A protein has these predicted regions:
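C-terminal accessory helical subdomains adjacent to catalytic cores in phosphodiester-
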Residues: 1-5, 17-48, 58-212
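Short hydrophobic beta-strand that contains or immediately precedes a catalytic carboxylate
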Residues: 8-10
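Short polar catalytic/cofactor-binding loops
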Residues: 12-15
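Short helix-initiation/N-cap motifs at beta->coil->alpha
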Residues: 53-56
Length: 212
């Protein structure tokens, strides 16, 4: 019997010898709920695939049917833009300058998930996790707490810079995202529309339920 997996191709990651294993560990802990759901529905495990660059992540995902024909594979990337309510996620990446991604023939809406505008928006949902990571000198009160998916990348990045620049670990760096996501509470990310969508719609896909 062939072991089937849920594979999530995720954009990002730092550089270095242990970059792949560190990235996978951080995201797998955050996605533990979906891993357990996968196990309960006949999958061997949920596996995180570090895509590195954005284009490379998409390219790895779209050829998965050849490399992993028995697995359920989905894509999780930064939106890099606002996503209007009700918009089709594949339309977002098809029309975004620099992407122009075309949905593979086998993929549905539930095979693509977006972090709006980017992963840092998800990190900001859990300010306790940021406090735990950056420790002394972190200024929690400088981070926004409302309408996070409507805030631009610049707004979030500037707020993170101001909140972390005097901390024990210094200013936030993009390569730290996978370390922080490891301690972010999924329930906090679920307060965002697209965060909730990841857990709800991928959960239904894992259970084999009809798409809504």
């Amino acid at each position: 019997m062939v072991n089937r997996h849920v594979r999530i191709y995720i954009e990002g990651g730092a550089e270095g010898r242990d970059a792949n294993s560190d990235f996978r560990r951080g995201w797998k802990k955050f996605l533990k709920e979906l891993h357990e759901l996968a196990r309960a529905n006949g999958y061997h495990s949920l596996e995180v695939v570090r895509g590195k660059g954005r284009g490379n992540t998409f390219n790895s995902f779209k050829v998965h049917e050849r490399e992993h024909p028995n697995d359920l594979c989905v894509l999780l990337v930064d939106a890099e833009t606002a996503v209007p309510e009700g918009a089709c996620v594949w339309d977002v990446v098809a029309h975004r300058e620099g992407d122009n991604w075309q949905r593979p023939s086998w993929a549905t809406e539930n095979h693509l998930y977006l972090m709006v505008h980017f992963v840092e928006t998800w990190l900001v949902t859990d300010q306790d996790a940021l406090q735990k990571f950056f420790k002394q000198g972190f200024k929690q009160g400088l981070l926004p707490t409302t309408h996070l998916e409507a805030r631009s990348k610049d707004d979030i990045e500037q707020a993170l810079e101001k909140a972390t620049q005097g901390s024990s670990k210094g200013s936030y760096r993009h390569g730290q995202a996978h370390e922080i996501i490891e301690i972010v509470r999924p329930d906090r990310v679920k307060t965002l529309r697209h965060g909730q969508r990841l857990f709800d719609d991928l959960g239904r896909l894992i259970k084999g339920e009809p798409e809504t």
